């Protein structure tokens, strides 16, 4: 009976640790308890074959790829907790595997390399104003601008 109690305590402590860690955005070292602004970032391809990012925000609004379009400008307010949900929706071809990533260097936002239909969520705190580039390290044409005001 005592062993079961210790086991339950270990499970609770481990769960509490991971719950606490999930509250810490990638660019700060303390927990942030705010409702995040959710931004869905999807990889896409324009009609002329160029790779790009599309986005949809919990604030509404959607941008669809157009021929020759570069990636959208994202605007958020300083002090917001932002949750990026990144998904690679570009299918593999017989000659090439689809791999993409998403990065904002100034905020330590770096996704893993995502294969077809893989996804990842990353939280960061928009704690400084300015204009910051976001990009895919594998495809230089996949880039855009993040504005924090």
Question: For each of these PLM feature ranges, what is it?
Answer:
Residues 2-149:
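Extracytoplasmic copper-binding redox domains, predominantly the cupredoxin/blue-copper superfamily
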């Amino acid at each position: 009976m005592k062993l079961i109690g210790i086991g339950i305590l270990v499970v609770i402590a481990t769960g509490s640790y991971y719950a606490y860690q999930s509250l810490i955005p990638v660019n700060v070292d303390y927990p942030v308890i705010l409702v995040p602004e959710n931004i869905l970032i999807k990889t896409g391809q324009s009609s002329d074959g160029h790779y790009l990012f599309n986005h949809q925000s919990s604030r509404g609004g959607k941008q669809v790829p157009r021929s020759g379009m570069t990636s959208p400008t994202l605007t958020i307010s300083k002090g917001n907790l932002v949750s990026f949900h990144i998904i690679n929706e570009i299918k593999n071809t017989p000659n090439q595997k689809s791999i993409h990533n998403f990065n904002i260097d100034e905020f330590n936002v770096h996704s893993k390399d995502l294969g077809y239909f893989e996804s990842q969520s990353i939280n960061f705190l928009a704690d400084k104003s300015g204009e910051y580039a976001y990009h895919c390290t594998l495809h230089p044409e996949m880039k855009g601008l993040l504005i924090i005001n």
